[in-house]
UniProtKB/Swiss-Prot annotation:
Disulfide bonds: none annotated. Residues 19-34, 677-691, 700-714 have a biased composition (Basic and acidic residues). This is ATP-dependent RNA helicase DBP4. Residues 730-739, 761-770, 805-816 have a biased composition (Acidic residues). Residues 84-258 form the Helicase ATP-binding domain. A motif (Q motif) lies at residues 53-81. ATP-dependent RNA helicase required for ribosome biogenesis. Involved in the release of U14 snoRNA in pre-ribosomal complexes. Required for pre-rRNA cleavage at site A2. Keywords: ATP-binding, Helicase, Hydrolase, Nucleotide-binding, Nucleus, Ribosome biogenesis, RNA-binding, rRNA processing. Interacts with the U3 and U14 snoRNAs. Associates with pre-ribosomal complexes. It comes from the Eukaryota. ATP binds at residues 97-104. Belongs to the DEAD box helicase family. DDX10/DBP4 subfamily. It is an enzyme of class 3 (hydrolase).
Length: 825
C-alpha cells in the first residue's frame, strides 16, 4: 500500500508541468505574434480614413492604449487624427495646428510605438530625443509622457539645465527617451563622454519654428551633426515653416505636411475673443493697473518684452496691492523658482502672472481667462502663440493687445496676413487711474525699485530699437520722456544706442593742429614718453579709487553723469582732462601756423564762485570729479525764511542802529515794552488764580470724601453686622463723650477690624465699657506655638504701630489725629 502510494505519487509528479523557461518563451511568442499583428495593421492602415475617430481605432500596443485610457484620452483631435497614422508608418512629419489642439500627444504616441516595435531596452541606449525651446514646455511634455507611458518599461529623463551637469551626465547613459532644451543637450553632447546617440530612432522638435529661428539656429546645427541620418523626424508647431533650408538642415526625407486647420478662417481658436486697445506709451501702465482692478476674479497672464519690465511691474504693483494675487516669471530666475511659480499659477483659481515669452509657447495653464500683451509682439507668430495660452481644448478665452499709436497700422496688417481677427475697443475714462505719482513715491523710497525702473526703460527701448520690422516699430516716434515719467522716474535715462552728433569730435576739431604740433615738438626734443608701469604714490592711488558698489556704475550711466561719453563710442569719463591746453590766443596762433607758442603751456584756471581753481596736477584733475571736494570753492548758501507777509528774510536777521532809531525814543519803547509785558502778566495771573481755586476745591472734596469714608468704617465697626453703633459710654459714663473715641476707631496696620464678628451686645462689658479687640483667630494650620511666636516677633519690634495714611496731613486737625494714634497703647 505504501509502495503503491509512493508509486502513485511519483507518477503524479511526472505529469507535464510548464517550467519557468517555457512560460517566458510562451510569453515572448505571444508578444511576437501581437507585434506582428500590429505591424500588419499599420501597413493596412489608411491615414486618411474617416473612420479613425478614437485612440481605440489606431493599431496601438496594449501598454500605450492602457496608458491613454488611464489618462482619460479617448477622442482624437484633428492634428492627432492626421499625424499619428503617418508617424506610425515611419514618415517624417511637418505638423501645424492651432494652439491647444493636442500636438503633444501627436508626437508622444509615435515615440512610444516606435521604441516598442524596435523592442528597445535600457541596454540599447538613447532611442528618442524630444527638443523643446523652453524649460517650462519641456517639463510639461515630460509629465504627459510619464502619464501615457506608465505601463512601458522605457527609462525617460528630463535635461533642461538649472541643475548639476555632473549628476545629469551620470544618468544619461541609461536613458531611452530624453526631453531636453537645445543648449543643455548640446552641452552634454560635447562634454559627456559616455553619451551615445548613434542608435537614435526618432527626433522630435516641438515648437519647431522657434527652435529653428536665429536664437537656436547654431545650437540646432551643432546638435544635428551628432545625430544619425537614418532617424525619423517629427516637427510640430502652431506656426510651421516650409523653408527648404530648414528642411535640409534637419535631413528630412520627403516630409508629410500636416495642417489640421489650413483651411480655417482664423489661425486662432474660434472660441477666443480677441481685441486690441490703442494706448499711448505713457499711459500703458495706468491702463494695465485699471484692467487688473476690474478683473479681480480672473486668471490673467500679462506678457512683456523683457525680464526687467516683468520685475519692475511686479515689484511696483505688489506695493500698490491691486487686489489680485501677483506672480512673475522670466528666464533669469532659478529653475526651482520657475517650477514653483508655474505650479502655483496652475493650481490657482484667481491670479495674475507677469511673464516674458518663456511661457508663450506650448505651456498649458488650466482655465486662463485673459491673455494681456502689454508690449507689442515682434511678429504675428509670437502673437498667435501668446494668445494660445487661453481658449485651450475647446474652452473659452479672451485676449487683449496694447498697441502704441505708431504700431497700430503696421501690426494689424501683419495679423491680417495670418488670418487673425481683431476688434478695437476703447477704455472707459472712469476705469483709468494714474499711478505715476505713486510709482514716483515708491522709487524715491526704494533705490532698488528706481534702478529696476531705469533698467526696464532701457530694456524696452532697446527691444524696440533692435526690431527688424521698422514699419511697425519706429523708435523715433516713441514718447521716451512720457514713458520715463509713467515709470515714476524723475528724468529720462541716457541710452547709449541712441546715436547723435559726435560732440567730442566736433569739440576737438579746432585743436587738432595744436595737438599734432605739440606731439611733434616733444618728439624732436627727444623727451621720453610716460611709462605706463611707473611707480604711483599712495595718494595717487587714493585719488583713483572708485565706488565698488554693484549699482554705482549703472547709476552714473543712467543719470547721464558720463556726459558726452553716453553719446559716443568711447568709454572715457566725464571731465577727464586729456591735455593741459594753452589760452585762446595760443590756440589761434597754433591754428594759423605759429608753432613757437605751442610749447609754452600754462595751468588751466577754473572759476568756481568767488574763488579760482588752478588745474596744475593730476590730483587737481581728479578733484573735478568730486562734488563734495568742490564745495569749499563754491559760495556758501544762504537760508531764507518767509514771514507772515510772504517776504523772504534771512534766518538770522539783526537790526542796525538806524533801523532801531526809526522806531522812536528808547524811553518810550521801554515804557511800551513794560506795559505790554504787564498786560501779559495780568492775563496770566487771572489764569493762575483760577487754577489755584480749582485745586483748593478739589482738595476740599477729597477731604470730605475721606471723612465720609471714615464715618462709614466707624459705624460698621461698632454696629457688629449692620447694627447701629453706640456713641455713649453706658450708665457709668454720665453722658460725657470720650474725646479719643474717634481716634481709637481709626484702623491700624496689621490689625483687622472686629466689626461684623458679633452683635452689638457682645462688644460691651457688664460695666458698660467697650471691650478691647479680640485676638486674631488662628488658622486651621496654626497651633499655640505659632501664635506665641507671632506675639514674640511683635514685641521684638518694640511695639511699634503703623498707621496707614491715605494722604499727607494738610491741617492741624490731621496732625493731632495722627499724633493721638501714635501715642495710643
Amino acid at each position: 500500500m505504501a509502495a503503491g502510494n509512493a508509486k502513485g505519487g511519483f507518477a503524479h509528479r511526472n505529469k507535464s508541468v510548464p517550467k519557468k523557461t517555457d512560460a517566458k518563451s510562451l510569453k515572448r511568442k505571444r508578444g511576437q505574434e501581437d507585434l506582428g499583428k500590429l505591424k500588419a495593421a499599420i501597413e493596412e492602415l489608411d491615414p486618411k480614413s474617416p473612420a479613425i475617430k478614437q485612440f481605440t481605432d489606431l493599431p496601438l500596443c496594449e501598454a500605450t492604449a492602457s496608458g491613454l485610457r488611464a489618462s482619460h484620452f479617448e477622442v482624437l483631435t484633428d492634428v492627432q487624427r492626421a499625424a499619428i497614422p503617418l508617424a506610425l508608418k515611419g514618415r517624417d512629419i511637418l505638423g501645424a495646428a492651432k494652439t491647444g489642439s493636442g500636438k503633444t500627444l501627436a508626437f508622444l504616441v509615435p515615440v512610444l510605438e516606435k521604441l516598442y516595435h524596435a523592442k528597445w531596452t535600457e541596454y540599447d541606449g538613447l532611442g528618442a530625443l524630444i527638443i523643446s525651446p523652453t524649460r517650462e514646455l519641456a517639463v510639461q511634455i515630460f509629465e504627459v509622457l510619464r502619464k501615457i507611458g506608465r505601463n512601458h518599461f522605457f527609462s525617460a529623463g528630463l535635461v533642461i539645465g538649472g541643475k548639476s551637469l555632473k549628476e545629469e551626465a551620470e544618468r544619461l547613459g541609461r536613458m531611452n527617451i530624453l526631453v531636453c532644451t537645445p543648449g543643455r543637450m548640446l552641452q552634454h553632447l560635447d562634454q559627456t563622454a559616455n553619451f551615445d546617440v548613434n542608435n537614435l530612432q526618432i527626433l522630435v522638435l516641438d515648437e519647431a519654428d522657434r527652435i529653428m529661428d536665429m536664437g537656436f539656429q547654431s545650437a540646432v546645427d551643432a546638435l544635428v551633426e551628432h545625430l544619425p541620418t537614418t532617424r525619423q523626424t517629427l516637427l510640430f508647431s502652431a506656426t510651421q515653416s516650409k523653408r527648404v533650408s530648414d528642411l535640409a538642415r534637419l535631413s528630412l526625407k520627403e516630409p508629410e505636411y500636416v495642417s489640421a486647420h489650413e483651411a480655417a478662417v482664423s489661425a486662432t481658436p474660434t472660441n477666443l475673443q480677441q481685441s486690441y486697445i490703442v494706448t499711448p506709451l505713457a499711459e500703458k501702465l495706468d491702463t494695465l493697473f485699471g484692467f487688473l482692478r476690474t478683473n479681480l476674479k480672473s486668471k490673467i497672464i500679462v506678457f512683456f518684452s523683457s525680464g526687467k519690465q516683468v520685475r519692475f511691474v511686479f515689484e511696483s504693483f505688489k506695493r500698490m496691492q491691486p487686489g489680485i494675487p501677483l506672480l512673475h516669471l522670466h528666464g533669469r530666475q532659478k529653475q526651482v523658482a520657475r517650477m514653483e511659480i508655474t505650479s502655483r499659477f496652475s493650481s490657482a483659481k484667481y491670479g495674475c502672472l507677469f511673464a516674458t515669452d518663456v511661457v508663450a509657447r506650448g505651456v498649458d495653464f488650466p482655465a486662463v481667462d485673459w491673455v494681456v500683451q502689454a508690449d507689442c509682439p515682434e511678429d504675428a507668430d509670437t502673437y498667435i502663440h501668446r494668445v494660445g495660452r487661453t481658449a485651450r481644448y475647446e474652452s473659452k478665452g479672451r485676449a487683449v493687445l496694447f498697441l502704441e499709436p505708431s504700431e497700430e497700422a503696421g501690426f494689424l496688417k501683419r495679423l491680417e496676413q495670418k488670418k487673425v481677427p481683431l476688434q478695437k475697443v476703447n477704455v472707459r475714462e472712469n476705469k483709468k487711474k494714474s499711478i505715476k505719482n505713486e510709482l514716483q513715491s515708491y522709487n524715491f523710497q526704494s533705490p532698488d525699485l528706481k534702478y529696476l525702473g531705469q533698467k526696464a526703460f532701457i530694456s524696452y527701448t532697446r527691444s524696440i530699437y533692435l526690431q527688424k520690422d521698422k514699419e511697425v516699430f519706429n523708435f523715433n516716434k516713441l514718447d521716451l520722456d512720457g514713458y520715463a515719467a509713467s515709470l515714476g522716474l524723475a528724468g529720462t535715462p541716457q541710452i547709449k544706442y541712441q546715436k547723435g552728433d559726435d560732440i567730442k569730435r566736433l569739440k576737438n576739431a579746432s585743436r587738432a593742429a595744436i595737438s599734432s604740433g605739440s606731439e611733434s615738438d616733444s618728439d624732436d626734443e627727444g623727451k621720453p614718453k610716460k611709462d605706463k608701469k611707473q611707480v604711483r604714490t599712495k595718494y595717487e592711488k587714493m585719488a583713483e579709487r572708485q565706488n565698488q558698489d554693484i549699482l554705482s556704475s549703472h547709476y552714473r550711466k543712467l543719470l547721464g553723469e558720463d556726459g558726452d561719453a553716453a553719446a559716443s563710442d568711447d568709454d572715457d569719463d566725464f571731465l577727464s582732462v586729456k591735455r593741459v591746453l594753452a589760452d585762446d590766443a595760443q590756440i589761434d596762433a597754433a591754428a594759423g601756423g605759429d608753432a613757437t607758442n605751442t610749447t609754452t603751456t600754462e595751468p588751466k584756471v577754473i572759476k568756481l564762485g568767488n574763488s579760482e581753481l588752478i588745474i596744475d596736477s593730476n590730483r587737481r584733475e581728479k578733484l573735478l570729479k568730486s562734488k563734495k571736494k568742490l564745495l569749499k570753492y563754491m559760495d556758501k548758501g544762504t537760508k531764507l525764511v518767509f514771514d507772515d507777509d510772504g517776504v523772504a528774510r534771512p534766518v538770522y536777521e539783526l537790526q542796525d542802529e538806524d533801523d532801531f532809531a526809526q522806531q522812536g525814543p528808547a524811553a518810550a519803547l521801554r515804557q511800551q515794552f513794560v506795559a505790554a509785558e504787564s498786560e501779559k502778566v495780568k492775563e496770566a495771573d487771572v489764569d493762575d488764580k483760577q487754577a489755584a481755586k480749582m485745586r483748593r476745591r478739589e482738595k476740599r472734596e477729597r477731604q470730605k470724601a475721606r471723612e465720609r469714608g471714615e464715618e462709614l468704617e466707624r459705624v460698621g465697626a461698632g454696629g457688629g453686622g449692620g447694627g447701629v453703633a453706640m456713641l455713649d459710654g453706658g450708665e457709668g459714663d454720665e453722658g460725657d463723650e470720650d474725646p479719643l473715641a474717634l481716634l481709637r476707631s481709626l484702623p491700624i496696620a496689621g490689625e483687622e477690624s472686629d466689626g461684623g464678628r458679633g452683635g452689638g451686645g457682645e462688644d460691651e462689658g457688664d460695666d458698660g465699657e467697650v471691650e478691647p479687640p479680640r485676638k486674631k483667630a488662628r488658622k486651621w494650620f496654626q497651633d499655640d506655638s505659632d501664635q506665641e511666636e507671632e506675639e514674640r516677633q511683635k514685641k521684638k519690634k518694640g511695639g511699634k504701630k503703623v498707621i496707614e495714611m491715605a494722604e499727607e496731613p494738610e491741617n492741624l486737625e490731621d496732625l493731632e489725629a495722627l499724633a493721638a494714634g501714635l501715642l495710643e497703647d
